[in-house]
Each structure stands twice: as C-alpha cells, then as structure tokens.
C-alpha cells in the first residue's frame, strides 16, 4: 500500500481532502500539500515518463494515466512506480537516492517501469537533477517509447522535439483544468504563452501502437 505523508512525516490518510483510487487492487492515497505551492518554481515541469516497450498489459499502464494526471494539483510527488515502489513521500529529503537509481538504471532499461513522476519543486534538488540530467542525453531518451509531459518551460519541449518525439495533444478538458489551477498562481497570460502539454511518441513505433495510445488518451 502506498502511504502519502506530509513534510512533518505524519500520515494524512484520514484527511478530508484525500482522494482514494484503486489500481490493480492497491489503494493509492493522495493528500493535498497546498503549503508547498509557495515553494514550487513553476518554471520547471511536472514530467511523467511512461515506458510502453515491455510485454506487460498495456491497458494497465494506459489506465494509470487517469490517476497519474491527477497529480498536477498536488504538490507532493517525487518518484512513483505503480508496481515496484511501495512507499514514497512528498519531501525530497526523505527520498532514498539508491531507490531512484534502481528505478532508472535497472528497471527503465528493461521496460519494467510503468511510470515515473518528478514534481517541479524537486527538480532543483540533487535527486531531481540527477534524473533530469540523464533524460537530456540521447541514450536516455532513446530508451523510451513515449514521454508524457507537461511543462511551462519551453526548453523541455524543445529537447523532446529535437529527439524526434511527435507531440500528441491531451484532451482539452485537462488543459482547462490546468489553466483553472495555475491561473491564480502565475496568471492566465503566462500560462497560455508557455504551457505545453501532450504525449510525445517516438517515430520508431509501429502505427498500431500509436493509434492504440491515441484512442486510450481520447477516452480519458
């Protein structure tokens, strides 16, 4: 069971603001951490990486997107893997570096990771920097079938495009929700000018897989 805790280390399971969803029989606990928003630098991005090259049930990974994208409104996620990581926290100081390296160096390369999420406020930390520096290399980017990304930092979008990932836009309702959330924080003009969100698919993938992904996203 994944237990989300706040920066004081207290469990927030019974907090009224918690949303509980189930994924493959596991309870996933969410907790609002609005007090962290003031510390967040929204020039950085919330990034999700979804590996689709493995032989696991692709529908499980696709279904997880609905849960995955609810995190944009919570300022608390460091690293999450749906099946391999059982417990993570909202504070980077509580993350174990070796756990991140285990995810990246061993599991990602053999296609076992369903999803990796890095919150913007962690990107300035040592752990986030290590992950993002690896993602900026040709070798790292070529290991992924698709990158699901949201950013108001154009540099990340340009990096994806430079590595020939094709952008597929997310449903408009998600963009509207993001706008509603971030407008009071950074203003509508800044958001609309800089926001980029979409699924970036590498052109090496067969058409059937691409159409399946498009169809799954359209159903969200």
Features from the language model and the residues they span:
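Conserved short alpha-helix immediately C-terminal to the canonical SAM/SAH-binding motif I
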Residues: 131, 155-156
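Conserved acetyl-CoA-binding loop of GNAT-fold acetyltransferases
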Residues: 161-171
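Conserved GNAT acetyl-CoA-binding A-motif
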Residues: 139-152
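Conserved acetyl-CoA-binding loop-helix of GNAT-fold acetyltransferases
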Residues: 118, 124-137
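Short amphipathic alpha-helix that is part of the acyltransferase structural core
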Residues: 2-66, 70, 75-79, 84-85, ...
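C-terminal "cap" of GNAT-fold acetyltransferases
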Residues: 174-220
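Conserved acyl-donor/pantetheine-binding loop and adjacent beta-alpha core of acyl/acetyltransferases
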Residues: 56-59, 63-117, 123, 173-192
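Short alpha-helical
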Residues: 28, 154-155
């Amino acid at each position: 069971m994944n237990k989300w805790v706040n920066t004081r280390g207290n469990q927030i399971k019974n907090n009224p603001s918690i949303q509980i969803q189930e994924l493959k029989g596991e309870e996933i606990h969410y907790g609002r951490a609005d007090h962290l928003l003031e510390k967040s630098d929204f020039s950085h991005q919330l990034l999700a990486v979804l590996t689709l090259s493995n032989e696991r049930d692709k529908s499980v990974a696709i279904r997880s997107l609905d849960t995955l994208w609810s995190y944009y409104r919570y300022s608390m996620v460091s690293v999450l893997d749906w099946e391999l990581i059982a417990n993570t926290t909202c504070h980077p100081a509580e993350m174990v570096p070796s756990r991140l390296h285990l995810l990246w160096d061993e599991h990602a390369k053999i296609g076992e990771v369903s999803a990796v999420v890095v919150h913007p406020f962690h990107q300035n930390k040592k752990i986030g920097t290590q992950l993002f520096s690896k993602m900026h290399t040709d070798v790292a980017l070529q290991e992924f079938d698709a990158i699901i990304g949201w950013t108001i930092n154009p540099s990340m979008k340009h990096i994806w495009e430079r590595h020939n990932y094709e952008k597929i836009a997310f449903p408009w309702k998600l963009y509207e929700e993001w706008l509603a959330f971030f407008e009071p924080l950074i203003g509508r003009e800044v958001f609309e000018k800089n926001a980029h969100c979409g699924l970036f698919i590498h052109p090496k993938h067969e058409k059937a897989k691409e159409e399946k992904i498009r169809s799954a996203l359209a159903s969200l």
